[in-house]
């Protein structure tokens, strides 16, 4: 099992990131997640806590999947006026796990929508752990109804 220094999960959140209030009760329970939105730059991140880890002391794949499923549509909300207020339920989510994210690591991701149609969003992103690529994600999302304000902000 990997052991991080005792203060690893209390390391400061990188400058510019603020707590994410969107996502509903599930993500509030499993987070906290943070967002940085400065101009065209949109990043999401979180610090790997003990409750996020697998028996090897690394980020559990299920938590990575949860993060990716938040990262991609919420990035699209902030980058596209076309769907900024719409609920984007996941149709398909593909994740390639590239490397482990150890306890205490800062996990950060960015995503882009290469294509938006009248009913679907196609998007992709990259996730890093302390700057090292750890996951590649792509997804297809349905353009749903107008979302409650606290679901997308």
Residue ranges and their predicted role:
Residues 1-153:
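Terminal targeting signals and extreme-terminal segments of soluble enzymes
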